[in-house]
Amino acid sequence: MDSDTLSGLLENVAKKFPDRRALSVSGKFNLTHARLHDLIERAASRLVSDAGIKPGDVVALTFPNTVEFVIMFLAVIRARATAAPLNAAYTAEEFEFYLSDSDSKLLLTSKEGNAPAQEAASKLKISHVTATLLDAGSDLVLSVADSDSVVDSATELVNHPDDGALFLHTSGTTSRPKGVPLTQLNLASSVKNIKAVYKLTESDSTVIVLPLFHVHGLLAGLLSSLGAGAAVTLPAAGRFSATTFWPDMKKYNATWYTAVPTIHQIILDRHASHPETEYPKLRFIRSCSASLAPVILSRLEEAFGAPVLEAYAMTEATHLMSSNPLPEEGPHKPGSVGKPVGQEMAILNEKGEIQEPNNKGEVCIRGPNVTKGYKNNPEANKAGFEFGWFHTGDIGYFDTDGYLHLVGRIKELINRGGEKISPIEVDAVLLTHPDVSQGVAFGVPDEKYGEEINCAVIPREGTTVTEEDIKAFCKKNLAAFKVPKRVFITDNLPKTASGKIQRRIVAQHFLEKP
């Protein structure tokens, strides 16, 4: 099968490493690459023959991080259909929007089901099928009757690079999520890029900490590992737990993990309050999906003895765009998201002209991993694909070593009386305060300056900080116009389902408070 498709890459891995561990559910069972491939092939056949799935159909999936999700996700793609993973915590109204916007033809869930998703599917007259795998030697049970169709094998299905494979919605800074269709080629290209930059091989092993309905956990954690012949462990609870994370990492001989900064901070807090007697020797730790403050990077390296590689990614790029290299390939720079990986990247001004090093502009990309455009959104496509490049909406610059530095989202830069303030810079200062665990800066409307800067912080466990403490600290470390006018002390920051802190949502949350 074509290695320009994800399905082809995984078939090649199953032939090359049939007996190596591919997927484990912690404390329950293990699947080899050959066994996983067999389960995927059988499930793909059932989707075609018994569920009536045709090439190009969209199939929605809503599961915790389970083996059934992995099998059914890959079976949908193998059946030449498009997988649309959805957050199991959505309301019925949200499910209705996403199922409708994606034109889903089928809803897949665990045997326990998902009442809001099923309610929405029923309203839209979308069929519902459950999937269950009791143990490693069992057949996958689908809640759809066996047909007498002669199509009993997926071997007749030929996957093509331009087949639709994945449909996701952006969580971006705009209020209306945009639908992002991605192809087999997009997925295969991204998996190859991730494998290459981190030198993933069949000897690697990781534990999934991020939800698999999000592109970060799905591509960087799961698919790149499977595509390298490596091993993936899913937590027994189907989601991240700070309590079981290190025991799982040790039990399954993990060599690396990838997470968002908020998860890294939770892991650090756990290390401070309940340290392990020893930690596994990791090749690297990866951080992506939001800016990692240099102070957090250094704390992670000090605590766990592994290089922390910050990367830069977007749904529209099928995740990875740039990354800091492994130590043997060059320095990793705190505060930088590294060098482009497997694609062209340029800094453009508003006229579409490429900028020289150290000059700021919009980060733009093009390559085989990049979506061809948003679904049914000509306005977003016109703005997003100018001058022959995809426009990320991020402001950044290359240094003279070719490393990318991000300043912030175009829409998140705070314009205080004409002074442009990067909230990322303020975040970094907040996180150097010894008593601050998490912190985020954001812009708010202001009659005098147009916009003013505010921030919210979570104190470290067992400490107390005041608004005056934070302001005084910021005055020592920032120019006067960058010091937050108001500081919210809190024990919780609103996050997206993937653990990202979005400034727009944080600003709304705290502005609603008196």
Swiss-Prot record:
Molecular function as annotated in GO: ATP binding; oxalate-CoA ligase activity
Organism lineage string: Eukaryota, Viridiplantae, Streptophyta, Embryophyta, Tracheophyta
Annotated Pfam families: AMP-binding (PF00501), AMP-binding_C (PF13193)
Compartments, record wording: Cytoplasm
Region (SBD2): 311-374
Name by which UniProt lists this protein: Oxalate--CoA ligase
Effect listed in the UniProt record for changing K500A: Abolished activity
GO cellular component terms listed in the entry, alphabetical order: apoplast; chloroplast; chloroplast stroma; cytoplasm; cytosol; plasmodesma
Keyword ATP-binding attached: yes
Chain positions recorded as oxalate binding sites: S289, M314, H319, K500
Effect of R409A: Abolished activity
Catalytic activity: oxalate + ATP + CoA = oxalyl-CoA + AMP + diphosphate
Binding site for ATP: 170-174, 214, 289-291, 310-311, 315, 394, 409, 500
Enzyme class: ligase
Source organism per UniProt: Arabidopsis thaliana
InterPro entries: AMP-bd_C, AMP-bd_C_sf, AMP-binding_CS, AMP-dep_synth/lig_dom, ANL_N_sf, Pcs60-like
